[in-house]
């Protein structure tokens, strides 16, 4: 009898050990790169502070927020699946991209006012906008190989098309629309940040409510498309509110021509500020909120209470002013040189 009992206990202990080992191995399988990427990003984000407050809060506080409409768990694992915080390839890629774009946009931002460089400048801005939108559409949907290659391919194609086939008036028209679209993104982030109740720093805003209430949050790509539509509508509203600046009927009006200089300086300063913010990110290990790979990402990476966001936006504003000042300085010097050329120079030659 004792022999049977010992045999039975040995069998139970062995099966339990085997079961535990199997569970451990299965858990290791599920800890893939995508889950690890999200885990590391979330642990380094301000949302971790919110989670900590929930864990250490009393039951009454937890009861108040646990019944809220929760759209995060359906999409947050995809939102930042490829990011600099947890992916070394992405960190090196964005750093090299920023290093390349910094001198290029500095040059066209200062010297791109001349007629022979206007097409190059506007095509470059259109290509960079295509890069931002492509990153937004592909990140969280495709793997890192496609996320790092396809946006560059799209941007290069748009640049070639703009330089070779597009008229200058067409480029100015869409440059103004790009400006309105980026302003719409900032307005959306500000309104979302102000209207939130503090339950989640990375808020989806109005696009998220439409996504969950009407479409029940089926596919993350649908949320991306809805967000682009919302930003496009806000952009059209801005154009309608300021027709003298953005309307197609006023492409050559004095106020539009003057404002175009500020628009170009503002847009050229974005990749410049991104490069400076990238250095700040690498040194301080914070999130670069204007990183092109997550610039349009929803939920937004811009958190107006974080040091990284305040630094990046401040640098962006400062670079916009500096680009405008240097651009006007170069243009004034160029006009002075032209005025000193004798009017009868062609006859003399």
From Swiss-Prot:
Disruption phenotype: Severe developmental defects in male gametocytogenesis leading to a reduction in the number of mature gametocytes. Impaired male gametocyte exflagellation. Female gametogenesis is normal. Defects in zygote-to-ookinete development. Severe reduction in the number of oocysts in the midgut of mosquitoes fed on mice infected with knockout parasites. Normal asexual development in host erythrocytes. The keyword Manganese does not apply. Residues 1-18 form the signal peptide. The chain crosses the membrane at residues 92-112, 118-138, 141-161, 177-197, 219-239, 263-283, 306-326. Residues 19-91, 139-140, 198-218, 284-305 are extracellular. It comes from the Eukaryota. Keywords: Cell membrane, Membrane, Signal, Transmembrane, Transmembrane helix. It is found in: Cell membrane. GO terms for cellular component: plasma membrane. One of its GO terms (biological process) is male gamete generation. Residues 113-117, 162-176, 240-262, 327-349 are cytoplasmic. Antibodies against G37/pbg37 partially reduce parasite transmission during the mosquito vector stage by preventing male gametocyte exflagellation and fertilization. Involved in the development of male gametocytes. This is Sexual stage-specific protein G37. It comes from Plasmodium berghei (strain Anka).
